[in-house]
């Protein structure tokens, strides 16, 4: 489909929360209304014992595979599997001890910033750097599932890059590719999307996941958007060269005999562009021609006396 990497989530329901019926642990409203936290995470978890096979397969097909650990035991598992990078989820953005533990691996770290204010984002960055992280990317993120596109606030991307001096990407939970394409134009260097093979196969994140066709489109559209930026410049582009001849120029539109004076009835500014530039029309009027000229002849100074 064109993706550069696959990111998993490494947790179990027991490492995320406790199995409790207390109202604090029950979701009210939204996509997962009525779920207990424990039951939702139980449904969505990727068993630890599956990870080795998935990483082995990713290496076999030569695609980068990494994961989001949600506690220290997940980090330890991923270290044993020699994961090349890590991600911190938005909901763990304030878990500074976990961020420090992940950063201490000295591996590249991607951190989502959903729900975090700027002071919290600064704390995340300081914690990661203080624990040894050298390669850091922050993801602008709206932690709503799905996220409303009109609350994307993508102008945060260049602002965050300017303030913090790190690469910025987008963790996109909207249901279309629009926000991701715009983000790439604004300088996002990484786009994250939830992925599902078939939305008819319902899952915890199916409502805001993209399918293979949509992922292929996303990869092409974001790459094209980035390539379209080019650089600021006013020189003619190679792709335009072939069409120069279809510009307007000055042509004889009436037969004229050698020695006659050109009048405005003899010439017009028309396409194609093989004649003198349109701005020279007034210069031609009142001049004499030095040979017989038929209608449809491009003007040139070689045809003019003096």
Regions found by a protein language model. Give the residues of each.
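Catalytic cores and adjacent flexible loops of soluble metabolic enzymes
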Residues: 1-306
């Amino acid at each position: 489909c064109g993706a550069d990497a696959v990111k998993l989530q490494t947790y179990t329901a027991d490492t995320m929360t406790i199995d409790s019926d207390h109202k604090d642990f029950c979701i009210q409203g939204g996509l997962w209304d009525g779920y207990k936290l424990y039951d939702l995470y139980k449904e969505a978890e990727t068993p630890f014992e599956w990870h080795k096979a998935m990483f082995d397969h990713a290496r076999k097909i030569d695609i980068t595979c990494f994961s989001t650990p949600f506690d220290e035991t997940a980090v330890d598992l991923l270290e044993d599997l020699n994961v090349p990078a890590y991600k911190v989820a938005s909901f763990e953005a304030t878990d500074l001890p976990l961020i420090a533990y992940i950063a201490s691996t000295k591996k590249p770290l991607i951190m989502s910033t959903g729900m975090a204010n700027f002071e919290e984002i600064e704390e995340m960055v300081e914690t990661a750097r203080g624990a040894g992280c050298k390669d850091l990317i922050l993801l602008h993120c709206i932690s709503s599932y799905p996220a409303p596109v009109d609350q994307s606030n993508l102008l945060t991307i260049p602002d965050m890059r300017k303030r913090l001096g790190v690469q910025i990407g987008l963790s996109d939970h909207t249901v279309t590719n629009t926000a991701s394409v715009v983000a790439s134009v604004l300088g996002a260097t990484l786009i994250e999307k939830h992925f599902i093979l078939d939305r008819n196969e319902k899952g915890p994140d199916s409502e805001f996941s993209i399918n293979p066709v949509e992922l292929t489109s996303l990869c092409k559209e974001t790459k094209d958007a980035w390539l379209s930026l080019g650089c600021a410049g006013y020189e003619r582009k190679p792709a335009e060269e072939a069409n120069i001849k279809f510009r307007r120029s000055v042509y004889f539109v009436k037969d004229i005999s050698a020695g006659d004076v050109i009048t405005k009835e003899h010439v017009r500014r028309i396409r194609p562009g093989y004649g003198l530039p349109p701005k020279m029309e007034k210069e031609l009027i009142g001049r004499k021609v030095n040979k017989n000229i038929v209608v449809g002849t491009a003007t040139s100074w070689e045809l003019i006396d003096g």
